[in-house]
Amino acid sequence: MQAPPSFYEGDTLEVAKKLLGQKLVHIVDGIKRSGIIVEVEAYKGPDDKAAHSYGGRRTDRTEVMFGAPGHAYVYLIYGMYHCFNVITAPVGTPQGVLIRALEPVDGIEEIKLARYNKTDITKAQYKNLTNGPGKLCRALGITLEERGVSLQSDTLHIELVPEEEHISSQYKITAGPRINIDYAEEAVHYPWRFYYEGHPFVSKK
């Protein structure tokens, strides 16, 4: 079942934690690629100095952050790696959750090809398929084309995992500082990164 629009409403930190254990799905050329979300970071603009929308900054890139919750915010870092975010909070409040790592589930062969141009890969390469925001976007075929797409779409959405299959019974959620935001002054220390402690696909322990 797809997460309904109401899933993305409410406090961004709570939505971030709710996303853990759910499945991010992208249909590419009719083939489902997906992974269980195991690591996220919350960004609470306009007061969060780590957020692109800090100070209410509106640009062509950040405009989608000011829109309705439950949409995709995709951007490039270093001019080459895509990052996928889920927009949260009411219209006009530019907040979102960065998906940092997944455990691959569906379309594994397509994911391997997208990452390594081959399907015969080592154990180390398998562990590196989706353990970072740029890696998971490449694996799932998420690009700037998906920016602003509603997560009620047939081709890009969050699939709710039934309680009996949910990995929350196996892993404890841990909170800590976000990664690679050294510019963000006091926001560097906010414990707004949430992840499953000990999960092999988490990007950084």
Swiss-Prot record:
InterPro entries from the UniProt entry: Formyl_transferase-like_C_sf (IPR011034), MPG (IPR003180), MPG_sf (IPR036995)
> Looking at the record's lineage, which domain of life comes first?
Bacteria
GO annotation (BP), single: base-excision repair
Q: What class of enzyme is it?
A: hydrolase
What keywords sit in the KW lines? DNA damage, DNA repair, Hydrolase
Q: Which EC numbers characterise this protein's activity in its record?
A: 3.2.2.-
Specify whether Flavoprotein is a keyword of the entry. no
Q: Which Gene Ontology molecular-function terms are recorded?
A: alkylbase DNA N-glycosylase activity; DNA binding
Family the UniProt entry places it in: Belongs to the DNA glycosylase MPG family.
Protein known as: Putative 3-methyladenine DNA glycosylase
